[in-house]
Amino acid sequence: MAGTIEVLVAGGQADPGPPLGPELGPTPVDVQAVVNEINDQTEAFDGTEVPVTIDYDDDGSFDIDVGVPPTAALIKDELDFETGSGEPNEEFVADMSAEQLKTVAEQKLPDLLAYDTRNAAKEVAGTCVSLGVTIEGEDARTFNQRLDNGEFDDVFAEAEPAA
């Protein structure tokens, strides 16, 4: 490959302007073709910031690799709020259900070190602490303890590896 460009774009909403245009302009690739391909591959993340890597050759060919959005962005998108709490241990901005936590954990699982959705959910819950988001009406750390104690086995049962 002749080069690599890494950018964050709004899912399904990339355009030839910044940050893509200035990065792609000096390269041999068709900028609009790259933009269209990025939008096709990121439309499921509509509006959420998504990391994208573009590898290109001197002949104008290119490959696009779409990453998973940051955990905080997935949580904000799932719960529909803009910014986390300035005082996350004192002021809470949203409450997440166990089902919503599972949804975010499943989306993020490929990027995490967790080996199943239950453990991915515990990692996502850690981000909830930083954002000031409660889970099932309580602090995310308390939720993780309850999850370890099996209180949410019904929600995460299908995520367990087959025995």
Swiss-Prot record:
Keywords: Ribonucleoprotein, Ribosomal protein, RNA-binding, rRNA-binding. PROSITE patterns: RIBOSOMAL_L11. GO terms for biological process: translation. InterPro entries: Ribosomal_uL11, Ribosomal_uL11_C, Ribosomal_uL11_C_sf, Ribosomal_uL11_CS, Ribosomal_uL11_N, Ribosomal_uL11_N_sf. One of its GO terms (cellular component) is large ribosomal subunit. GO terms for molecular function: large ribosomal subunit rRNA binding; structural constituent of ribosome. SUPFAM superfamilies: Ribosomal L11/L12e N-terminal domain, Ribosomal protein L11, C-terminal domain. Residues 1-25 are annotated as: Disordered. Forms part of the ribosomal stalk which helps the ribosome interact with GTP-bound translation factors. Part of the ribosomal stalk of the 50S ribosomal subunit. Interacts with L10 and the large rRNA to form the base of the stalk. L10 forms an elongated spine to which L12 dimers bind in a sequential fashion forming a multimeric L10(L12)X complex. Belongs to the universal ribosomal protein uL11 family. This is Large ribosomal subunit protein uL11. It comes from Natronomonas pharaonis (strain ATCC 35678 / DSM 2160 / CIP 103997 / JCM 8858 / NBRC 14720 / NCIMB 2260 / Gabara). The lineage of its organism: Archaea, Methanobacteriati, Methanobacteriota, Stenosarchaea group, Halobacteria.
